[in-house]
């Protein structure tokens, strides 16, 4: 870390505290964590009447951790040059944070949907259950779920066990989640699906199989995965504000439904690098850590059709092996990664909205890894100052700052009401990958107030009213709708067409709206904000609805 003078150091700490306290007060919400200064300190978290004292991770410069700042700069620049939308980056070396960055409007305190990164959390819960003697790897599904088992189960189903679920080799040719019309009886449907292959012999990606592990944890412990892990892992290593989507039966969707913060991703990775130890306390036995993170099964076969090279190096217990020898990762859709390098004692946590996660991983190998030296410490360089400046400026570009003052005054005085068919409430209209179901409410009316740097969009649902603020200064502005954090940016695309980009910050993306104003009505079209690579918004299919003045 660079040697700060006392005055500069004091100002730095006060700056961080003020920023985070201001965000908490302005957003009228409580956050469990605040951004940390460069040194370690403790913070107190109150959880259901219990007080937890959590020590923050130490902060150092990359050079103080033996990493070249220039390699981090080049990673960020290369990802951006290739159009990969990064949301956060955190690097730990020897348990210390040596790089942390968030692309505004994403931040350090908002948990984000992890998709299949969730599987590594579920796997960890299974490890604790095995350690406590509540479960064994060779325990058969037909014995755990006798009431859900077919009357005459086939030999492959009878052989399916916990190990085969952990290694994505239960024997099913396809994940039933793509075939189900309803999840009401999903455990029954899983057990009655075709188990075509002998368990343990054929890798096939199966998120419902991971959800079955959650059902097993609940059946064995009476607790959901997050409840079970809270005193055993989360509280111990400082993971806070963890949530998970529920399936019917009040069972957590551990295959894809967890939401965590970037630092919590890094903490989980460090826990695995520590081989189950945290602050000198053994939490999970190292035999499990070794099994979970080593290659248990090949991922190259005729059934698992994935030609991306980063998914062809084997699979452990819900962890992927990586192209560079010795590395493994927790891996979620659209580029939610915690990459662990045991030899270098490094964790790289990334969140993003990318349809090219394979390319994102390759940029990690090509740019980041080469800058991690075997030295404990490097001399400070001007690159660290450049990196700090780059981190401070990182942001998802908002819509181009184009105003239409004459029409803004005219149309900003009108309340547009829904007429005819029902329209989903605004939060449901926005959606985005990783949204947990719908609120099920209807939109009633909407109005616009164009201000100096933003547009206040007053949203009236049938049971709720709130304001969404969209930046009209080329940036995203953050506000709350139904208690959820949204970011929005707007500009005039044509004389009477307002373009509005809205992101639900708990998810990886959001929705692009085109709002066409006429004398007595507005016409709203929408499409996903995250198109396929190379696809233009003009080529998308847009949903359409009309509101009248």
What are these regions (language model features)?
Residues 50, 382-549:
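Peripheral terminal and inter-domain segments
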Residues 51, 332-397:
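Structured C-terminal helix/loop/strand segments within mature extracytoplasmic catalytic/sensor domains
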Residues 67, 96-101, 140-143, 175-199, ...:
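Short, charged, amphipathic alpha-helices and their helix-cap/turn boundaries
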Residues 71-107, 345-348:
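A short, well-structured edge-of-sheet supersecondary motif
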Residues 95, 112-138, 165, 213-217, ...:
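Active-site SXXK
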Residues 113, 132-170, 192, 221-256, ...:
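Active-site helix/loop module of the DD-peptidase/beta-lactamase fold
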Residues 209-216, 256-277, 289, 336-353:
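Active-site-proximal alpha-helical segments within enzyme catalytic domains
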Residues 290-348:
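Active-site Gly/Thr loop motif
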């Amino acid at each position: 870390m660079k040697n700060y003078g006392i005055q500069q150091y004091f100002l730095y700490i006060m700056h961080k505290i003020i920023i985070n306290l201001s965000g908490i007060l302005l957003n009228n919400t409580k956050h469990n964590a605040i951004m940390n200064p460069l040194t370690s300190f403790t913070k107190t978290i109150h959880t259901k009447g219990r007080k937890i004292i959590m020590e923050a991770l130490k902060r150092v410069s990359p050079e103080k951790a033996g990493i070249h700042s220039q390699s981090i700069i080049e990673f960020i620049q290369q990802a951006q040059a290739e159009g990969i939308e990064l949301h956060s980056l955190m690097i730990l070396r020897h348990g210390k944070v040596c790089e942390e960055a968030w692309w505004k409007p994403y931040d350090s305190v908002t948990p984000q949907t992890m998709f299949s990164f969730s599987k590594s959390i579920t796997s960890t819960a299974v490890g604790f259950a095995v350690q406590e003697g509540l479960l064994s790897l060779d325990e058969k599904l037909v014995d755990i779920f006798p009431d859900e088992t077919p009357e005459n189960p086939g030999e492959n189903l009878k052989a399916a066990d916990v190990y085969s679920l952990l290694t994505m080799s239960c024997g099913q040719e396809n994940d039933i989640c793509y075939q189900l019309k309803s999840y009401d009886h999903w455990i029954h449907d899983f057990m009655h699906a075709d188990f075509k292959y002998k368990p343990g012999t054929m890798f096939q990606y199966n998120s419902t199989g991971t959800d079955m592990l959650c059902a097993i944890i609940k059946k064995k412990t009476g607790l959901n995965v997050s409840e079970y892990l809270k005193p055993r892992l989360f509280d111990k290593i400082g993971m806070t504000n963890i949530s998970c989507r529920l399936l019917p039966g009040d069972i957590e969707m551990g295959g894809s439904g967890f939401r965590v913060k970037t630092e919590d991703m890094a903490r989980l990775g460090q826990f695995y690098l520590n081989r189950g130890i945290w602050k000198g306390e053994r939490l999970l036995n190292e035999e499990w850590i070794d099994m979970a993170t080593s290659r248990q099964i090949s991922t190259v076969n005729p059934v698992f059709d994935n030609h991306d090279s980063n998914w062809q190096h084997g699979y452990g217990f819900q962890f992927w092996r990586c192209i560079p020898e010795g590395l493994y990762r927790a891996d979620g859709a659209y580029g939610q990664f915690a990459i662990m390098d045991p030899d270098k004692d490094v964790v790289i946590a990334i969140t993003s909205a990318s349809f090219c996660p394979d390319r994102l991983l390759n940029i990690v190998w090509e740019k980041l890894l080469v800058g991690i030296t075997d030295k404990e410490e490097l001399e400070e360089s001007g690159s660290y100052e450049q990196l700090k400046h780059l981190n401070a400026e990182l942001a998802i570009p908002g819509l181009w700052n184009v105003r239409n003052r004459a029409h803004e005054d005219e149309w900003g005085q009108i309340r547009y009401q829904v007429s005819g068919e029902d329209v989903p409430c605004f939060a449901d209209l926005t959606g985005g990958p990783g949204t947990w179901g719908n609120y099920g409410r209807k939109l009633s009316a909407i109005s616009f107030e164009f201000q100096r740097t933003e547009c206040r969009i007053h949203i009236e649902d049938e049971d709720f009213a709130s304001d969404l603020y969209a930046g009209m200064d080329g940036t995203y502005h953050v506000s709350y709708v139904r208690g959820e954090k949204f970011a929005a940016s707007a500009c005039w695309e044509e004389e009477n067409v307002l373009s509005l980009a809205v992101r639900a910050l708990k998810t990886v993306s959001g929705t692009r709206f085109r709002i066409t104003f006429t004398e007595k009505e507005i016409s709203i079209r929408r499409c996903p904000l995250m198109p396929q690579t190379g696809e233009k918004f003009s080529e998308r299919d847009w949903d359409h609805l009309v509101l009248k003045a």
